[in-house]
Amino acid sequence: MNLLFTPDNFSVRFRDLTGYADADIPFVKIKPSLESATYEIIELIGETSYNEVEAVDNLENEYYRLVARAVALKADIIYQPTSNLARTKNGLKNRNDDQTSTPWKWQVDDYQASLLQNYYRHLDVLLRYMIKNDKSINLKKYDTKDLFVKDIETFEQFFDINGSHYLYFKLLPALVECERKEIEPRVRTITTLTD
């Protein structure tokens, strides 16, 4: 797996994609977070789709930009909690300079919650784009063709999830289990009784 970011393009791309980063984060410090985020996005969209995006390597391409933004947002969420702390020989120390002050815990919590909401909203945009443009999503994990509830539109006839494709995909394992353990045995019983 290759990253969508390199030491040469990271700072400019990261600021451009997140829209809120106002400082240069050294690539070496955030690289482990970028790797974790990339694996998570590959798990969602599938390796074939990721490889297709990686081959483009152009921020002007909408699909590339959507995937790269998802990786950047998730990497930032992973990186942020440790970015203000330094592990020294004397234990953890708060990084601070003369121009800034340490935020209150509630401010940090609110900030991290808003980052997460932004990330989830963006994943929905990415998934909508992929569905609309017939891009394959990780079909091994999110194959819905054999389900009674094959798509989000059918699901939302009964439960409103505000059009969140990401939430729908997260609920799929439970839907599959419910259909196999609860619905299919009942349908087989009804079919047997009517024969």
Pin down the residues of each PLM region:
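Conserved short "hinge" loops at termini or chain/domain junctions
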Residues: 1-68, 82-195
